[in-house]
Design a protein with these regions (language model features):
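Noncatalytic carbohydrate-binding groove/subsite architecture in carbohydrate-active enzymes
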Residues: 212-347
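Short Pro-Gly-centered flexible turn/kink motifs
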Residues: 496-508
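Acidic, Ser/Thr/Pro-rich beta/coil linker or hinge segments at domain junctions
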Residues: 454-499
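Carbohydrate-binding surface patches
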Residues: 420-455, 461, 504-505
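N-terminal secretory signal peptides and thylakoid transit peptides that target proteins
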Residues: 1-15
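Bacterial Sec-dependent signal peptides at the C-terminal "C-region" and cleavage site
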Residues: 18-28
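Aromatic/acidic polysaccharide-binding cleft in carbohydrate-active enzymes
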Residues: 324-399, 411-426
């Protein structure tokens, strides 16, 4: 009887709250608490790639005086708390993993063909995995997939830089086999147990890489060889379109190799502005920031279009394969270095993109909104002052940190919400979480909170709301986008006014 009385009591409170919302005339965010899917722990991945002379990235994060990762960098990464860190990118086409293992003094330098200069190999498998472990992240490696078919890497002045299926399989053994002699010979007794591996990076892009059929054949060969070494690994195949193709590679990839793959990858960094007179080039946005805001919302629409397209292709194959967005930074002109990404203006794109990934969380299981770290590219989540100094989060990093720290385990739906608010909702026992982006450049939006069949008894708000959308983060003001915390005022109706352009995480007690 006591359970029934409690149920009737809660139902009465919920009904009274709904009635009060109606009487007040307040616009409400109404949540349907029915669980729709489990939220992946890998929606806030970061992507690390040695970038040579283009952006010091990995080298900038290493402290050669201490012979360790920079302490300020590690502290910032722990605060960011990514669930996965990926190593790879175009760099994987000529990366030879064995050059980055064993005694440091014996590791050779190698040319960074895509990004200029040379890499020291000071950071290899052991050091990368160590960073992941310190941050509480799972490592993800993009293997050398026969150089993605780019023939030039077979005959470089330094020799053949491509890697075959056996080389990739040997890496799996080195990382995961408890009895691997090669690893033990380097003084590393325990395996790393790396479970996430990607086959192919942008394999469909350009005119020098594999054809679709060649890539699928290589995917089958690599998957078979790698899983023979460790059947428990999870593999990501390349499924984007390329070479003017109208269709994604994913359909044919899943038809022929789907049973060998856990994820299909696409990249969403190449969002080209749609307007012929766009202000999202160079410094044009500084004269018309509100128009830049509008264009960034338009670009975020394409993220949803691309994700929905891949969902449809996977469903058409009857596959259970998940989606992995393994690169998703906002690349604007000048290439990856537009200063708008230092400003809060860019928040509307980043917050909405991350919300899209979570709303599509039944299929999207790995995602990222940025490159990881560096000292020049503004697409980074973490910016490093060099040669030493502070590390700090860019707007995209601050939003990823906010959403990651205040999130539930199951995705739920939003039945209704005031115009101008973009929302992703989730829940865990006793709490409902809302990730809210106010897409209005000039207007605040007030909303009451309601959860169907449940009483909202209290809550907290964590909000980033600069007064000026042109607010910029920099090394002399690294904490300008630190969230402000507030408690929702008690009453028959819990409400909050979301400032113009704000990004907010709301925790509701139910």
């Amino acid at each position: 009887m006591s359970n029934r009385r409690e149920f009737l009591k809660q139902a009465g409170i919920a009904a009274a709250a709904q009635s009060a919302i109606g009487a007040s005339g307040a616009n409400a965010i109404v949540v349907d608490p029915k669980p729709l899917f489990d939220i992946s722990p890998h929606l806030y991945m970061q992507f690390m790639e040695p970038l040579g002379t283009t952006d010091s990235s990995v080298e900038a994060a290493w402290d050669y005086d201490r012979d360790d990762w920079r302490k300020d960098f590690v502290d910032t990464v722990k605060d960011l708390a990514p669930d996965v860190i990926r190593w790879g990118g175009i760099y994987s086409r000529y990366y030879k993993w064995r050059e980055g293992i064993g005694p440091v003094a014996r590791r050779p330098w190698h040319r960074n063909y895509a990004w200029g200069g040379k890499e020291t190999n000071r950071v290899g498998t052991r050091e990368f995995v160590d960073l992941c472990r310190r941050a509480g992240a799972e490592p993800l490696y993009c293997v050398n997939f026969l150089g993605d078919g780019e023939k030039w890497y077979r005959n470089t002045p330094e020799g053949d830089r491509t890697g075959d299926a056996r080389e990739a399989a040997d890496w799996v053994s080195y990382a995961n086999d408890p009895d691997n002699r090669e690893r033990k010979g380097h003084g590393v007794a325990e395996p790393s147990n790396i479970k996430l591996w990607q086959l192919g990076n942008e394999t469909s892009y350009g005119n020098q890489t594999f054809t679709r059929d060649e890539a699928i054949a290589a995917t089958i060969e690599f998957a078979k060889a790698m899983r023979e070494r460790d059947p428990s690994i999870r593999l990501i195949g390349w499924g984007d379109r390329g070479r003017g193709a109208n269709q994604l590679w994913a359909g044919e990839l899943l038809k022929r190799a789907g049973e060998r793959l856990d994820y299909v990858a696409i990249h969403l960094m190449g969002q080209s502005p749609k307007r012929p007179d766009t202000v999202l080039k160079g410094l044009r946005y500084q004269k018309e920031p509100e128009r830049a805001w509008e264009e960034l919302i338009e670009l975020s629409n394409n993220v949803e279009t691309r994700v929905s397209e891949l969902e449809s292709v996977i469903a058409s194959q009857g596959a259970r394969t998940s989606i992995a967005v393994t690169e998703g930074h906002l690349s604007l002109s000048p290439h990856n270095a537009n200063p708008i990404l230092c400003e809060w203006l860019s928040a509307v794109y980043h917050a909405r993109s991350l919300n899209i990934y979570q709303r599509h969380g039944a299929r999207v299981k790995i995602a990222t909104g940025a490159d990881f770290e560096g000292n020049r590219w503004t697409v980074n989540a973490v910016m490093l002052q060099t040669p030493r100094g502070v590390s700090y989060l860019m707007p995209v990093g601050s939003i990823a940190r906010l959403f990651k720290k205040h999130n539930g385990r199951q995705g739920v739906g939003v039945k209704s919400a005031p115009a101008g608010l973009d929302i992703a909702a989730s829940r865990t026992a006793g709490k409902v979480y809302l990730h809210v982006a106010n897409l209005e450049y000039r207007k605040s939006v007030e909303a009451a909170f309601a959860v169907d069949g449940m009483a909202v008894t209290g809550g907290r708000v964590f909000e980033i709301a600069p007064e000026d959308p042109r607010q910029c983060v920099w090394q002399d003001q690294p904490d300008v986008f630190k969230p402000r915390e507030a408690t929702l005022a008690s009453g028959p109706v819990l409400k909050w006014r979301f400032p113009a352009g704000s990004v907010t995480a709301v925790e509701l007690d139910v």
